[in-house]
Design a protein with these regions (language model features):
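Glycine-rich phosphate-binding active-site loops on the catalytic face of alpha/beta enzymes
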Residues: 43-49, 132-137, 208-219, 275-276, ...
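Iron-sulfur cluster-binding cysteine motifs and their immediate structural context
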Residues: 363-382, 396-411
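C-terminal helical cap(s) of enzyme catalytic domains, especially alpha/beta-barrels
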Residues: 53-66, 218-248, 286-287, 298-323
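Active-site beta->alpha loop and helix N-cap motifs at the rims of alpha/beta catalytic domains
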Residues: 66-165
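Glycine/Thr-rich beta-alpha phosphate-binding loop at enzyme active sites
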Residues: 135-166, 197-264, 268, 302
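Alpha-helix-loop-beta-strand connector modules within alpha/beta enzyme cores
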Residues: 64-97, 155-185, 235-269, 310-323
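Catalytic cores of alpha/beta
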Residues: 28-32, 114-125, 191-204, 264-265, ...
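N-terminal capping/small domains of soluble enzymes
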Residues: 1-99, 104-111
Length: 412
């Protein structure tokens, strides 16, 4: 059973990469991840600007352990360039797995491009096996990472927004020219224009596209209309939660669609990240088109020890299905998902009711969109009756029926 991955020249013993996050701020974390079987490690994001306000932040994370999710975020650390250099240098003395350095790519200026390129060169010299350019787009402004820009939490707008994809393209070209190691590009789902960004990345010769980062939103269940004062996520050490809080299972709904979208749009290998909480999600990400996966929240909640269970579950699944390698099921979902309605071929069908099963509950007659010019389903003599001329063939009623009395059949 072969679960190895070749990713931009890196030899990974399995598809589990530790994503950039607060789980990657010191050497002990990297050593522990390697011990439990991580294939590679990406360090916490580095802000290469001296005195950036984001560097003084502190980690604040509330966890819902039963739901296997983060309940709230109120802050996270950043590394300065010197800290990132030290971490990479120390890690390469202690571990054998590939270790990459995450570097933020912020404001679309020539000065920023030069700063990022210089930082990448320095981290490469310290032994980084790859560089990950964290192209968060408008997010650094939202985070208020710099002193002059972003204190109000406003997004990029106007000319700055228009320049960002081109800026990313030029920065990647500059970094690729400056270093002789693979360069990854990380995308945020809250970015200005994800399709334009990944296209710019591929055009610039990026080696791997990391799709992606935490999403804008609040975790389900955190709003209590009866106790609005608890909106802070039960934090003792913070008075608010961050709106960039979509992680775990909730984030995976977005990440899988973006992985598929990226797989349809570019040929560059994709590192699938976002809501990978167990082996099943690794399989799903690979079936969505990912070459490998990056995991963060699951480790923040349950520790690196779950890597062993992830690998065991993956191998067991492959044995049960008869897969010898990851390539055999990579991308299986890609052609089953369309990006636009125009890509989908629909068939003329109508709803058929099995009156022996029908209880006459009337649920099938309630959907507001039912019918061409009037409702296609009526309840007559305590049974659902379909007017085939009015039936849209939408299949909603078949899914609603608690008795499974409705099936869809092709029109002759």
């Amino acid at each position: 059973m072969d679960i190895r991955v070749k990713l931009a020249g890196l030899e990974l013993k399995n598809p589990v990469v530790v994503a950039s996050g607060d789980i990657g701020c010191h050497v002990g974390q990297i050593k522990e991840a390697e011990h439990f079987g991580a294939a590679a490690f990406i360090t916490k994001g580095c802000i290469p600007l001296s005195g950036a306000s984001g560097l003084s932040r502190r980690t604040r994370i509330r966890v819902d352990f039963k739901k296997n999710a983060l309940r709230g975020l109120a802050g996270f650390r950043r590394l300065g360039l010197e800290q990132a250099e030290s971490l990479i240098s120390d890690a390469k003395k202690e571990v054998k797995i590939p270790v990459g350095a995450n570097v933020f790519v912020m404001l679309p200026t020539e000065e920023e491009k030069e700063i990022v390129t210089a930082a990448a060169k320095r981290l490469c010299r310290k032994g980084a096996d790859f560089i990950e350019l964290d192209t968060t787009g408008n997010l650094p402004v939202h985070f208020g990472e710099t002193e002059k820009i972003g204190k109000t939490g406003e997004y990029f707008s106007g000319d700055m927004a228009e320049r960002y994809p081109r800026f990313v393209y030029e920065t990647i070209k500059a970094v690729k020219k400056a270093v002789d190691i693979p360069v990854f590009g990380k995308v945020a789902y809250e970015n200005i224009n994800v399709p334009a960004l990944i296209s710019a990345m591929e055009g610039a010769g990026i080696d791997v596209i990391d799709v992606g980062n935490a999403g804008m939103g609040v975790m389900p269940g955190i709003m209590d209309i009866h106790k609005p004062d608890r909106m802070a996520g039960d934090f003792v050490s913070a008075d608010k939660i961050l709106s960039l809080c979509l992680t775990g299972d909730a984030l995976r709904r977005f990440s899988q669609a973006y992985i598929i979208r990226s797989a349809k749009s570019v040929s560059t290998p994709i590192l699938g990240c976002g809501g990978i909480m167990g082996w099943r999600h690794i399989v799903e990400a690979i079936m969505c088109g990912a070459a490998a996966t990056a995991v963060c929240s699951a480790f923040a909640i349950r520790g690196f020890g779950i890597i062993r269970k992830m690998k065991e579950g993956l191998i067991r699944f492959m044995e049960e299905k008869g897969y010898d390698s990851l390539d055999e099921f990579r991308g299986l979902f890609v052609d089953r998902v369309a990006l636009t309605p125009g890509e989908i071929r629909v068939f003329d069908v109508v709803a058929k009711v099995d009156h022996e099963k029908c209880s006459g509950c009337g649920l099938c007659a309630k959907p507001a969109h039912c019918g061409v010019s009037e409702r296609a389903i009526k309840i007559l003599d305590n049974k659902a009756v379909v007017d085939e001329a009015q039936c849209l063939g939408c299949e909603t009623c078949a899914g609603i029926c608690p008795e499974t009395a409705i099936t869809m059949v092709r029109k002759r």
